[in-house]
A protein has these predicted regions:
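Core beta-strand elements of the Rossmann-like FAD/NAD(P) dinucleotide-binding domain
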Residues: 215, 360-369
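Active-site substrate-recognition segment that forms the wall
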Residues: 200-219, 225-237, 246, 251-266, ...
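Short hydrophobic core segments
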Residues: 220-221, 244, 365-377, 537
Length: 574
């Protein structure tokens, strides 16, 4: 199936992507999504397709669900259109990462002004699909997203035939920017050709030293939600990943939370934490939909946020989830090997290969890339390097400032039927998940405490009472004291330690900024690991593989491990 106006053969597809690990398409006008659907289907039906298809598209306004109605498509393609329509719901201004075809097709939809959105990218496309640039500066902006050899298709339908002079100007602008057009027949509806400038391309487009051009062997230290999400993202890209953890099983730390909420943070100014958690929560829900069982491991229930100043906000795109189930699902990818009961005590680098060793000095293997995703453990491991590693003082400062914040979650089963309970989870100052299926019946969860002192955290009785007091303020019921009533049933407490950064945002990126040593960090998920982990993984692998970023370049800096530290010393949950 071809989209009206676009013949995939005019840009060499699908033949040119045969045998490639990945292929990146940049489309400056998403319109009704038909170009994307056409290319997605071509990828599905091609036995020589690349492992990953990245499609980056700009839409000036949020695409309308009705545009993608199933009735517009043949029966065997309706499922694709319906899946896309579902994923396009509730998309606002900004970047949106949408994973399709078992996460092997990545659609990055950028909603907003074309020039602004295009300026937030740093990748180079293999294929460019665009509207005719309005002037030479627009043509130059498109050129910045190309590499030598990029095939392009420029839609000239709006001006073709009506203004031959405009077509001539367009051809001149394109050629001056480095786009070499094929033969242009009279009344052509598009310009096609290759980006092949006569001059040397600026070195600013040269991939960073941190980029690894092809998949290899990677070791990840830590099998919690941070490490598992990175492992899965790398395995999808063909990496052979080994995940080490000192516990016998994955999710041995804070990721073993019995149930938690993936819900966006909100702020009056829609600050980076709010934007990143909104993107990350939506991305995590895509993984859950693909890998977990609804009603058992997770539920896209939505979450009602009670505001401290009064009123409430309904988060439609939010869920409750059992993190350990997702961690286990991520780690079941055939490209991942989990090794438990193994503490990584030292990392050495020689001849471009990292060697990991346990406390007894035993060799745990050699790897091109190592990702430290072991929360507070990363600080101690980084101090033990036996080779010179150039860590910037600012990153050293941020690692030294990591806080171990202890938290306790109360949970149990109902001793009696309770009227007036909410149907969906509620959060605010604390949270309450009213209905999660369990072996002993329907479970409830309330919490969690946020204790910087281990002595206070060790008094589980006091921690439970604090949870119940917070719950009574979150959900004041006239008929009965909710905390006291819940405590009549079978109640347990679950405790763990969170790794919290100075500004409550994770640290993601290469540990060394001056060389591509292959040592990366993904830590500091804090109290919002469910909202950040999947996004952090996408960001890390995008930077490692020179892929399109999952969020705006300017926003991604808020997660960069080497970002400038902003001072913050409070110990309150966000």
């Amino acid at each position: 199936m071809q989209t009206p106006g676009l013949d995939l053969a005019s840009v060499g597809l699908p033949e040119v992507w045969a045998g490639c690990d990945a292929w990146t398409v940049f489309d400056t006008d998403f319109l009704d999504g038909q170009r994307f659907l056409s290319l997605w289907r071509a990828w599905q039906h091609d036995s020589l397709r690349p492992r990953l298809l990245h499609y980056v598209a700009i839409a000036s306004v949020a695409p309308c669900m009705a545009t993608h109605g199933a009735g517009h498509h043949a029966d065997h393609h309706r499922g694709d259109a319906q899946e896309l329509a579902t994923q396009l719901l509730d998309r606002g201004i900004g970047f949106h990462r949408i994973l399709l075809s078992n996460a092997q097709v990545s659609l990055t939809l950028c909603i907003g002004d074309v020039q602004t959105m295009a300026g937030e990218h740093v990748f180079q496309a293999d294929t460019l699909l665009c509207s005719a640039p309005a002037n030479k500066w627009a043509a130059q902006a498109l050129a910045r997203r190309c590499k030598r050899g990029t095939r392009f298709w420029m839609d000239t339908a709006p001006i073709s035939g009506a203004d031959a002079v405009a077509i001539g100007h367009l051809s001149d602008w394109a050629q001056a920017a480095g786009f070499q057009s094929d033969h242009i027949p009279p009344h052509a509806q598009a310009l096609c050709g290759t980006f092949n400038p006569r001059w040397d391309i600026p070195t600013s487009r040269t991939p960073s030293a941190h980029v690894v051009p092809s998949p290899g062997r990677c070791a990840i230290v830590g099998a919690g939600i941070a490490g598992a999400s990175v492992a899965h993202a790398l395995a999808l890209r063909g990496w052979q990943v080994t995940v080490f953890d000192q516990e016998a099983h994955p999710s041995g730390g804070a990721s073993g939370l019995p149930a938690g909420l993936a819900v966006p943070h909100t702020s009056a100014d829609d600050n980076p934490r709010s934007r990143l958690s909104r993107s990350g929560s939506r991305l995590l829900m895509q993984h859950a939909e693909r890998l977990l069982v609804r009603g058992q491991d997770w539920e896209p229930s939505g979450v009602l946020e009670k505001r401290a100043e009064g009123g409430a906000l309904w988060h439609r795109q939010a869920c409750w989830i059992t993190p350990a189930a997702l961690v286990q699902a991520w780690l079941t990818h055939p490209g991942i090997t989990f090794i438990g009961n193994t503490k990584v005590a030292a990392i050495q680098r020689a001849d471009g290969v990292w060697t990991l060793r346990d406390p007894q000095g035993r060799d745990l293997g050699g790897y091109a890339v190592v990702v430290l995703a072991n929360a507070m453990g990363c600080a101690k491991l980084l101090k033990g390097f036996e080779v010179g590693v150039q860590i910037q003082p600012d990153l050293q400062d941020k690692i030294a400032a990591l806080q171990a914040i202890h938290g306790t979650l109360s949970h149990g089963t109902y001793a009696e039927a309770l009227a007036g309970l909410p149907e969906t989870p509620v959060n605010g100052n604390g949270c309450f998940i009213p209905r999660v299926p369990g072996a002993a019946g329907t479970q409830w969860f309330a919490g969690s405490t946020f204790e910087p002192e281990i002595r206070a955290a060790s008094d589980l009785g006091a921690q439970h009472m604090a949870n119940m007091e917070r719950l009574n303020h979150l959900l004041p019921l006239e008929a009965f004291d909710l905390g006291e009533t819940l405590s009549r049933g079978q109640v347990s407490q679950w405790s763990a330690t969170r790794c919290v950064t100075h500004d409550r945002l994770p640290l993601v990126g290469p540990i060394e900024t001056t060389s591509g040593s292959g040592l990366w960090l993904c830590a500091g998920m804090g109290a919002r690991g469910l909202s950040f982990s999947a996004l952090c993984a996408e960001l890390l692998v995008a930077r490692l593989g020179a892929e399109p970023l999952p969020v705006e370049f300017s926003l991604s800096g808020s997660l960069d491990a080497n970002r400038v530290r902003r001072k913050r010393v409070d110990t309150q949950p966000d």
